Amino acid sequence: MRGFGVHSEVGKLRTVMVCRPSLAHQRLTPANCHDLLFDDVLWVHEAQKDHFDFVLKMQERGVEVLELHDLLGQTLANQQARDFLLDRRITPNVLGSQIAEAMRPWLDEMPAAQLAAFMIGGIAISDLPEVKAKSLMLSALPETDFVIPPIPNTLFQRDPSCWIYGGVTCNPMFWPARRAETLIQRAIYKFHPIFLGGDFQIWWGDSDQPFANASMEGGDVMPIGNGTVLIGMGERTTYQAVGQVAQALFRSKAAKRVVGCLMPKSRAAMHLDTVFSFCDRDVVTLFAEVVDQVRCYSMYPKDDDGTFEIHPDNRPMLDVVAEALDLPQLRTVETGGNSYQAEREQWDDGNNVVALEPGVVVAYDRNTYTNTLLRKAGIEVITIRGSELGRGRGGGHCMTCPIWRDPAY
């Protein structure tokens, strides 16, 4: 029987969602990759092989792996789900009224799997021969222009939603280029047979309202256990969102403490999990240069309506986390090598590992210094190739959205 809920960062991982490299990555070019928030273009064939290996290694450890294209295709077989998604993606505000009117009937008749591929991989003018004839505007645009841009960052399933104890948030993303990812997750959680009627709540974010300055991405969110949630506040996650999530969790008595971790804002440390991740119940890997600068603010419930009080904490982040988990201290594995090598390995996601169970993690093979230190600390490190998958700046933690994970304490 499948369950729902993520109750730690290192308990037995039972169900996870991923997204394989596909059409969206085939459409990345040096000219458009930065607009689509990807640092580089991939050798897609090799990235697909490496991602398949990643999935296989999780499955060999008993993890159920759900794939986004498959889930979305199955979801869009439901007419209500199709309407939900297209009503929000194919609009005059997004496309212009003439293009929206020309495209909608074509998309309404499209097979579900093909529609899913286009919703993730984008729709170019060259994909629209039948529709193009009905729109003067489309006829005037270059064949390579996108009417619906690709969303290649779906490779990093950690961010658009995150499971926190017995529920999930649908995250309003910081950059407009990624916000369509959250809409896809909302459709899946609402309409896919796996989730329909499931025993979980959507804590926050399932709304069409503009979120203004409230943005959150799952790479910043860690339900570490013992009723505590860490939420990084750096480049992508804002205090406006953290406060609302804390209130929603406290209102439902789903958490007893939320720790906001104020981080320096930088591309290299865009999320908390790029500089800090759990490997075992008491072992973390971290990039000390950033983690040593983190300032913590603990939020505790005040009343049943979810209101809370905030307590600044002047202790190092590691002490705050250890105390929240009732541990005397955390054992740490810092990014390996000298200062140059450590900075390179952090950039290559050396600290962005995903735990399959206590003491077992998946990491990129290229981070040899950090992986060696993890093994010396007693961690089993399963490696996958990172030469292509890592070009978008994310490792095993970023590429996975745990849906069901056991407690660890």
From Swiss-Prot:
Protein's UniProt keywords contain Cytoplasm: yes
Domain of life: Bacteria
Cellular-component GO terms for this entry: cytoplasm
Record keywords, A-Z: Arginine metabolism, Cytoplasm, Hydrolase
EC number(s) stated in the UniProt entry for this protein: 3.5.3.6
Example of a GO MF term: arginine deiminase activity
Protein's name according to its UniProt entry: Arginine deiminase
Taxonomic source organism: Rhizobium etli
Underlying gene: arcA
